């Protein structure tokens, strides 16, 4: 989309590149206004000489010009509809079902900011915002001092004050108006003459928009190379500056020693180095070498803009201004590979390569991308039916690339040649060439989709109908993962690498997710709240586990309804041995130990028969005879005694103790 620009200049003798020659009849009112120009003041005559350069939009298919972007887009829809009708007609003649070629329906890409938009109406509304932004940036430039002004009134006041002060005493005599020329005959629309397109970088003229775009692509490649090699040149310049400073110090020291020894003139000793190309003199050989490299090098002709701090040269003032930000804001260095970047955002994007991060992942193939736009463009490759299909069999997801490709079948340029008229009708209509045979379609046995290749069919069955595969395996332990980024994170468990460090406590982690989860403990944020009791948690998994405490046991009428509780987080942990459900994994683990112990006892081999244990000893009865707290006698017997016999034994023992003898019991008595 062409950018809307308004420029202020004198009435040119030739048309600017890209303008259209148009002649309009001069009315009587305009003749009267032209005769009154001689009575204007110099400022009014200067203000009346302003003109606005009007840009038009050209159709990339037929070269037609339109004043607004809406007219161009509506006109290009006719080309798309004509192509779709022609393809449908050819397929009906062969006997095949017409293949739907999408026209205006589908995502469109903005040429200014590369944003994807779904409908033409939204695209027009989106590009109107760009037009309003560009319209607010119109400025008027003085052709003598190159100063910019936001309004024509300020521009006229500037011209009166600065550049017309010398001619105020003598008012300029306006040139006589040329006599009115007869109106030329109206030219047919097909004979519109187009001026060549001029490149703003190198002023190269191109005949067609396609050649102009191809030529500008070379400047983009050189710009990328310059930005890529800019840091290397800065490092080399810094090293050379250090060497030159050392040489300068050595030469100055030698000059001082020579002056002291010889006693020469100090005024001529410091200017001994002269430049061979210009009359300038330098104080040392290092300064002379630096002067010749910046002023007389071959690159100085094509890079006239020089940096005052590092003496680097650039081809445009915009690149010099962008380079100056590196001196103002400082450079950003990578701590891993010591690479230097001008912006902090570029350094952050570079650090993701070391960390192996991929913020946007494709769910079909597991590839990671740094931006959402690249992921959306990649996702189109997994679709079964592409948006745009050419007759030659090539498919395109971008409408602009599809239109550019179609021109290769018709010729170099899509615009008609200058002065060309409508081609004469052929005497005999030639039959259209037969369309190429459509590629073989492989239907999916599980759904109604069909694919042109076996690889796309297998990818579709694996992604849609098959179980989740773990195609990426660890080379150390053989564990499988769904995505490649998971393998990279898993390898850190083998290497012991923990590159993510907490700035608050210094603790390191193996993944960025674990670091983010840990940082919540320092901030005190608990974003997950229970709706029943109001308790807050730092992680959603802890909240889900806490929610099970509020759930009541559910009774089912039939046994087959019991496993459904696992789907609704009622009791998600199930024992496969006895069929019991548990709300926590810890309870399931404790329960499984019971089954493990039972299996251990069952699997133990039978022991050999052991000898019979000896009979237990006969029970003995102990009788203690006491008097006044003192033990008189202890009687042990293997048979229980009656109360009368026990009293007799105690009296006998008491009498024996008084007599000073021993009591002997007869076994027959006992």
From Swiss-Prot:
Q: Where is this region: Disordered?
A: 168-196, 217-304, 409-443, 601-621
PROSITE patterns from the xrefs? ZINC_FINGER_C2H2_1 (PS00028), ZINC_FINGER_C2H2_2 (PS50157)
- GO CC terms, sorted: nucleus
What are the Basic and acidic residues biased-composition ranges?
217-231
- Comp. bias regions, Acidic residues: 232-263
- Bias (Pro residues) ranges: 171-189, 423-442, 606-619
InterPro entries this protein is in?
Answer: Znf_C2H2_sf, Znf_C2H2_type
Question: What Pfam families does its record include?
Answer: zf-C2H2, zf-C2H2_4, zf-C2H2_6
Zn-finger (C2H2-type) residues: 57-79, 108-130, 140-163, 197-219, 305-327, 332-354, 360-382, 388-409, 442-465, 472-494, 500-522, 528-550, 573-595
Q: Which UniProt keywords apply?
A: DNA-binding, Epilepsy, Intellectual disability, Metal-binding, Nucleus, Repeat, Transcription, Transcription regulation, Zinc, Zinc-finger
Principal location class: nucleus
Which compartment or compartments is the protein found in? Nucleus
Task: Please describe, based on the UniProt annotation, the reported consequence of changing residue 160 to T.
Answer: In DENNED; uncertain significance
A GO MF label: zinc ion binding
Tissue-wise expression: Widely expressed.
What the entry lists under PANTHER family is as follows: ZINC FINGER AND BTB DOMAIN-CONTAINING (PTHR24399), ZINC FINGER PROTEIN 358-RELATED (PTHR24399:SF68)
What disease is associated with this protein? Dentici-Novelli neurodevelopmental syndrome: An autosomal recessive disorder characterized by global developmental delay and impaired intellectual development apparent from infancy. Disease severity is variable. More severely affected individuals have profound intellectual disability, axial hypotonia, peripheral spasticity, prenatal and postnatal microcephaly, early-onset seizures, brain imaging abnormalities, and are unable to walk or speak. Patients with a less severe phenotype may achieve some developmental goals and show less severe intellectual disability.
Function in brief: May be involved in transcriptional regulation.
Q: Which family does it belong to?
A: Belongs to the krueppel C2H2-type zinc-finger protein family.
- Protein name per Swiss-Prot or TrEMBL: Zinc finger protein 526
The organism that produces this protein has a lineage beginning with: Eukaryota, Metazoa, Chordata, Craniata, Vertebrata
């Amino acid at each position: 989309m062409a950018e809307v620009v308004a420029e202020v200049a004198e009435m040119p003798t030739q048309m600017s590149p890209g303008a259209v020659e148009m002649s309009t009849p001069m009315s009587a009112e305009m003749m009267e206004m032209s005769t009154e120009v001689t009575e204007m003041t110099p400022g009014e005559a200067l203000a009346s000489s302003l003109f606005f350069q009007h840009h038009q939009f050209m159709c990339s298919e037929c070269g037609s010009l339109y004043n607004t972007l809406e007219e161009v887009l509506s006109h290009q829809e006719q080309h798309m509809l004509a192509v779709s009708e022609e393809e449908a007609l050819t397929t009906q003649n062969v006997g095949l079902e017409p293949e739907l070629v999408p026209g205006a329906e589908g995502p469109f890409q903005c040429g200014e900011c590369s944003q994807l938009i779904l409908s033409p109406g939204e695209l027009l509304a989106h590009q109107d915002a760009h037009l309003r932004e560009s319209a607010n940036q119109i400025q008027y430039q003085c052709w003598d001092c190159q100063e910019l002004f936001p309004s024509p009134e300020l521009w006229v006041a500037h011209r009166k004050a600065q550049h017309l002060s010398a001619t105020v005493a003598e008012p300029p005599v306006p040139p006589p108006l040329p006599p009115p020329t007869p109106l030329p005959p109206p030219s047919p629309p097909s004979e519109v003459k187009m001026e060549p397109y001029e490149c703003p970088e190198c002023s190269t003229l191109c005949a067609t928009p396609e050649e102009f775009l191809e030529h500008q692509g070379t400047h983009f490649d050189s710009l990328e190379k310059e930005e890529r090699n800019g840091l290397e040149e800065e490092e080399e310049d810094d090293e050379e500056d250090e060497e030159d400073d050392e040489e300068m110090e050595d030469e100055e020291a030698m000059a001082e020693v020579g002056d002291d020894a010889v006693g020469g003139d100090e005024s001529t000793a410091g200017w001994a180095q002269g430049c061979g190309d210009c009359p300038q003199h330098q104080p040392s050989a290092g300064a002379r070498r630096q002067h010749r490299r910046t002023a007389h090098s071959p690159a100085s002709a094509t890079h006239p803009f020089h940096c005052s701090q590092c003496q680097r040269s650039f081809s445009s003032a915009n690149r010099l201004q962008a380079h100056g930000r590196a001196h103002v804001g400082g450079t950003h260095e990578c701590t891993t590979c010591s690479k230097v970047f001008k912006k902090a955002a570029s350094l952050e994007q570079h650090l993701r390569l070391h960390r192996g991060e991929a913020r946007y992942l494709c769910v079909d193939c597991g590839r990671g991308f740094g931006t959402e736009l690249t992921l959306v463009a990649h996702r189109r490759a997994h679709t079964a039916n592409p948006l745009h299909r050419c007759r030659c069999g090539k498919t395109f997801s971008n409408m602009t690339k599809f239109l550019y490709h179609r021109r290769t079948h018709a010729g170099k340029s899509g615009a008609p040649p200058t002065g060309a008229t409508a081609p004469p009708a052929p005497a005999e209509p030639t039959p259209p060439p037969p369309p190429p045979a459509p590629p073989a379609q492989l239907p999916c046995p599980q759904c109604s989709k069909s694919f042109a290749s076996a690889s796309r069919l297998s990818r579709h069955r694996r992604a849609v109908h098959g179980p989740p595969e773990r195609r990426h395996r660890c080379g150390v332990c053989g564990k499988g993962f769904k995505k490649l980024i998971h393998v990279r994170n898993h390898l850190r468990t083998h290497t012991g690498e923990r590159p993510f460090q907490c700035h608050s406590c210094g603790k390191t982690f193996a993944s960025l997710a674990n670091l983010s989860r840990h940082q919540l403990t320092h901030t005190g944020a608990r974003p997950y709240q229970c709706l029943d009791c109001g308790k807050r948690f730092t992680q959603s998994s802890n909240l889900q586990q806490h929610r099970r405490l509020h759930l009541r046991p559910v009774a089912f009428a039939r046994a087959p309804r019991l496993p459904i509780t696992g789907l609704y987080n009622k009791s998600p942990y199930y024992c496969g041995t006895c069929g019991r459900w548990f709300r926590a994994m810890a309870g399931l683990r404790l329960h499984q130990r019971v089954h493990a112990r039972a299996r251990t006892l069952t699997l133990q081999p039978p022991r050999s028969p052991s000898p019979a244990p000896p009979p237990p000893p006969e029970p003995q009865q102990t009788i203690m005879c006491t008097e006044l707290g003192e033990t008189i006698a202890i009687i042990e017997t293997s048979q229980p005694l009656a109360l009368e016999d026990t009293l007799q034994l105690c009296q006998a023992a008491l009498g024996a103790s008084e007599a000073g003898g021993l009591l002997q019991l007869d076994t027959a008595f006992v």
